[in-house]
Amino acid sequence: TNGNREKITREETAALRNKTVGIVGLSVGSTTAVALAMERGCGALKLADFDVVELSNMNRIRCALHELELPKWVVTARAIAEFDPFLELEIFEDGVTTENMDVFVSGCDVLVDACDSLGVKAALRLEAKRQACPVVMDTNDRGMLDIERYDRPEWTLGGFLHGRIDEPTMKSFAQAKIWTREALQAFVNVAEASERGQRSLPKVGTELVSWPQTYTGVCAGGAHAAEACRRLALGEALPDARI
């Protein structure tokens, strides 16, 4: 809009029309999707999630009671269509799998990892590296944001997640069905989490069914991820780093 001119220039707006962002997971991912759509941080979104909205999701997904049991992608796509019916959406209603991962990543300028599954997180990065596509991940703890520059292999230290995980280990994670302490440490490093995060994160996969997420964290993380996506899509030299 005119009010955003110079924050986002005419030239950038024109360039962003030709950019595609792929988002895997539509809990915190839905906030990123809506933020990108609202400021037109891309011209197209690929959305992937097989799950439905449950009552337990309503602490972090902005939706109405009448949307319970609807697929998460429906809730997200509907929210976007209500303010921008012209944004191009491509839906992967069965989520991403080993069978469609290459198709999902193909054509994306940036990927957002917002899923809970260890196997999918790992497989997404293997494919992102193969197709040279950057990945953004918000951990929803003390504002932690990962920007992974697989489009700039000279920056990634030859591995994944800023050199934290080597390729054989990532391939083994891609076959995993549940989170292990080793995987959690590799992806997050619990010692770097907030005090309360250090208490809750180690319980993922045992006492907690998924990542602990508060709506304040989801809002902040979704916005930060959306801005990172826009800046990456515009070719800014954002570092391969955990912020």
Where are these regions (language model features)?
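N-terminal charged helix/coil linker that caps or initiates catalytic domains
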Residues: T1-V21
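E1/E1-like adenylate-forming module used to activate ubiquitin-like modifiers
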Residues: D109-T216
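A structured beta-alpha segment of the ubiquitous adenosine-cofactor-binding alpha/beta core
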Residues: W73-D109, C115-K121
